[in-house]
């Protein structure tokens, strides 16, 4: 099913992830899901709370951040539809760590950031049996 976002929102995500380089950066995707199609309308950046020496290849947030984001999404009449994060100097392909910490109903936008420049964004969704991710069509529009 397609994942849709506008180009300016994609550029906002790219700028955020370029500023966190060489560490991983990330945030939540807000929007709506209808029959498997996801429309992303807003993002919220989240601080990486993983141990400093591990932030170059790991990303984590606090449970308090998660609860706060659910409240913010509800207040805006939106849903948490997914999560975005970077893979510094690595392909935009989910890692085993990503799979082990992912939720099947979320969309995951992973961006390869190479030498502080975002070069590729791909959309993924974890299978319900949690065995692997499937690539989703990413539609970036005007």
Q: What kind of feature is each model-predicted range?
A:
Residues 1-80, 88-142:
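Conserved beta-strand-loop surface patch within small alpha/beta domains used
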């Amino acid at each position: 099913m397609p994942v849709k976002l506008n180009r300016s929102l994609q550029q906002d995500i790219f700028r955020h992830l370029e500023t966190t380089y060489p560490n991983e950066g990330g945030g939540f995707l807000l929007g709506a899901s209808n029959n498997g199609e996801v429309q992303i309308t807003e993002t919220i950046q989240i601080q990486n709370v993983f141990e400093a020496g591990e932030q170059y290849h790991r990303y984590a947030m606090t449970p308090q951040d998660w609860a706060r984001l659910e409240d913010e999404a509800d207040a805006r009449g939106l849903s948490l539809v997914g999560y975005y994060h970077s893979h510094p100097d690595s392909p935009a392909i989910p890692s085993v760590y990503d799979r082990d910490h992912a939720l099947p109903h979320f969309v995951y936008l992973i961006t390869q950031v190479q030498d502080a420049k975002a070069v590729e964004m791909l959309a993924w969704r974890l299978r319900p049996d949690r065995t692997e991710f499937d690539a989703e069509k990413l539609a970036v529009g005007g």
